């Protein structure tokens, strides 16, 4: 139990209710304690998280601690990741993911090697947006974890860190991992590349059995920004899923790949308005006056968002005419 001392009369007034036999009373008292926003009240919150008999009280304590980054709080939340009740584990994981300081990240870091996969994945998730350089090594090791959620979170860390040394391992996961979400995440993380080294892996992802991976591959090829990807993206305009076609069209616009003009013009007649809109915007990005005829025909499209995109594209091409 944490040493608990306070002179705050508002906290002292809550103590009998914090020790009440009724879990509902204790939970409401914790909420009122947290509303005081007094650091002196933290020991009662961390103790409730650690030892209260009622899962609903422990879960509430985990939620209420999300705004605090004191070491005792971070340690208590990390320990709660292994709680026997799922609501407590989930609440602790969410609160940890809200932390912003590198100091908190360093306290979380040892938990990425915990025996429990949920703990490992949650610790990695909490570290992701902190951009803690010390997390790169453990994340690289976690790419080989036997549990897909752990691998997925490790990919996220390496992507946020823009850790280029991880590119070969990420390319392998993008092509070969058994889990669709891991392949999708790894494919997206390849966007940190600055050369064509990752193109073979992205081309493979563009032919993945899962459309979500193909969609991510098309997006990432646009981010990498290499014109060599143009032909593969043009082929992706024929994908069975319109979501993949949309991302391919957007990527072709980003690449200003003029060889896609005919295929993008055809998409202006597609039955899905979002795809017509993206095709119009991409044609504007190409900067080729040859697209003007198709765009002018699309000015009467039945969807206002498509018409707006057509107007934008026509304005872009005025100087190219």
Where do the protein language model's features map onto the residues?
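Amphipathic alpha-helical scaffolding segments comprising HEAT/armadillo-like alpha-solenoid repeats
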Residues: 6-17, 38-50, 70-82, 101-113, ...
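Alpha-helical segment of the N-proximal tetratricopeptide repeat
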Residues: 13-37
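Short inter-helical turns and helix N-cap capping residues of alpha-solenoid HEAT/ARM repeat scaffolds
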Residues: 21-22, 53-54, 84-85, 115-116, ...
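Core register positions within helices of long alpha-helical scaffolds
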Residues: 32, 64, 95-98, 126-129, ...
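A generic tandem-repeat structural signature
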Residues: 54-153, 160
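Ankyrin-repeat and related helical/solenoid repeat scaffolds used for protein-protein interactions
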Residues: 238-312
């Amino acid at each position: 139990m944490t040493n608990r001392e306070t002179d705050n009369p508002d906290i002292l007034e809550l103590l009998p209710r914090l020790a009440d036999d009724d879990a509902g009373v204790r939970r409401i008292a914790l909420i009122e304690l947290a509303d005081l926003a007094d650091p002196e009240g933290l020991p009662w919150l961390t103790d409730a998280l650690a030892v209260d008999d009622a899962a609903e009280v422990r879960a509430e304590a985990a939620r209420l601690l999300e705004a605090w980054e004191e070491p005792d709080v971070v340690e208590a939340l990390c320990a709660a990741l292994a709680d026997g009740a799922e609501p407590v584990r989930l609440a602790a994981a969410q609160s940890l993911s809200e932390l912003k300081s590198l100091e908190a990240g360093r306290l979380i870091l040892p938990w990425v090697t915990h025996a429990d996969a949920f703990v490992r994945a949650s610790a990695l998730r909490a570290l992701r947006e902190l951009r803690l350089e010390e997390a790169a090594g453990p994340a690289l090791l976690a790419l080989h974890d036997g549990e897909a959620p752990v691998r997925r979170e490790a990919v996220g860390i390496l992507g946020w860190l823009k850790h280029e040394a991880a590119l070969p391992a990420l390319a392998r996961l993008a092509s070969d991992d058994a889990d669709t979400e891991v392949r999708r995440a790894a494919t997206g993380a390849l966007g940190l590349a600055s050369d064509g080294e990752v193109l073979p892996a992205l081309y493979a992802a563009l032919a993945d059995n899962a459309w979500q991976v193909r969609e991510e591959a098309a997006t990432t090829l646009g981010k990498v920004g290499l014109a060599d990807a143009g032909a593969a993206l043009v082929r992706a305009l024929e994908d069975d899923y319109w979501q993949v076609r949309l991302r391919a069209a957007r990527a072709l616009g980003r690449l200003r790949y003029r060889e896609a003009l005919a295929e993008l013009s055809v998409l202006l007649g597609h039955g899905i308005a979002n795809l017509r809109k993206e095709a119009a915007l991409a044609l504007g990005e190409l900067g080729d006056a040859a697209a003007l005829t198709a765009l002018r025909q699309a000015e009467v499209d039945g969807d206002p968002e498509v018409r707006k995109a057509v107007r934008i594209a026509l304005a872009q091409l005025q100087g190219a005419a």
